[in-house]
Regions:
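Short, intrinsically disordered, charge-balanced linker/junction segments flanking boundaries
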Residues: 1-4, 178-185
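Short active-site-adjacent helix-start/loop capping segments
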Residues: 12-15, 48-52
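Glycine-rich, proline-tolerant flexible connector loops at the mouths of alpha/beta enzymes
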Residues: 8-20, 165
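Active-site cleft segment of glycoside hydrolase catalytic domains centered on the general acid/base Glu
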Residues: 22-26, 51-152, 158-181
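Generic detector of contiguous secondary-structure segments
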Residues: 16-30, 185
Length: 185
């Protein structure tokens, strides 16, 4: 079985409250289904340093202003439509959001926990987690943030062999050592 990461954005999938536009996602998900791929859905309310994008009807909420019920409802609609989705990530490059805003970690932990519980009631087999950029975590010593936000069913990592200036200077041997640090974090 193959696997695909699919990025769906709330402002595209539900541009009007309660009205879903499946035109783009049906094509992407249909191709994955046709090729027997399972899907990890990135429905990120956190994208690195930014929140969203959110639909206009939601506006630009702060982290504690995100309506959990609306998020659960939208995710439920997506998961009910696409049974090939077996894992969901609602925060990508999560470490970047909290690098200078650690005081909001408890707010996000509560939001995540409530959304997790709401999704698990209807979709108990779907795995739910957060994603981190390993190279950022290592280059900026953000392991503590990963440890605090290692909640849900899994922790996902992306990786680029870059230094703190975002230049590719790491040898394959150093990159392998970096990747092995996933098991230490």
């Amino acid at each position: 079985i193959g696997r695909s990461n699919v990025y769906l954005f709330w402002n595209i999938i539900e541009p009007v409250e309660g009205e879903f536009d499946w035109s783009q996602s049906d094509i992407i998900m249909g191709l994955n289904e046709k090729n027997d791929h399972k899907v990890t859905l990135y429905f990120s309310i956190i994208n690195g340093e930014t929140l969203g994008p959110f639909p206009n009807w939601i506006g630009k909420p702060t982290l504690n202003g995100i309506n959990e019920d609306e998020l659960v409802n939208t995710l439920d609609n997506i998961l009910s439509r696409y049974n090939i989705v077996d894992s969901v990530i609602i925060a990508g490059e999560t470490e970047s959001q909290f690098r200078y805003n650690e005081q909001f970690i408890p707010v996000y932990q509560e939001l995540f926990s409530n959304v997790y519980d709401g999704i698990k009631q209807k979709h108990p087999d779907v795995k739910f987690g957060n994603s981190f950029a390993l190279h950022q975590v290592l280059n900026k010593n953000l392991e503590d943030i990963v440890n605090e936000l290692a909640i849900g069913d899994f922790v996902a990592f992306s990786y680029a062999p870059t230094d703190i200036l975002n230049e590719i200077r790491k040898t394959p041997e150093v990159a392998i050592k970096d990747l092995n640090k996933i098991f230490e974090i």
